[in-house]
Swiss-Prot record:
Pfam families: Ribosomal_L28 (PF00830). This is Large ribosomal subunit protein bL28. One of its GO terms (molecular function) is structural constituent of ribosome. NCBIfam families: L28 (TIGR00009).
Amino acid sequence: MSAYCQVTGRKPGFGKQVSHSHRHTSRRWNPNVQRRKFYLPSEGRTITLTVSPKGLKTIDRDGIESVVAKIRARGEKI
């Protein structure tokens, strides 16, 4: 599962981890993304999306139909 939110587009952040002796090693901050199933009444089927908590709030606010329409308008296959 990739660390990418399909609703908000949130991706991992990259940076350095600094030890007590100030050695720098690469690391990444993964977003909190989970796979969730949503029911689309217009199509009569469920879809699975990888979403972050902010993406879930967006779905609650705007509705799953409009969010899926925006994702498909970007050219992403669901």
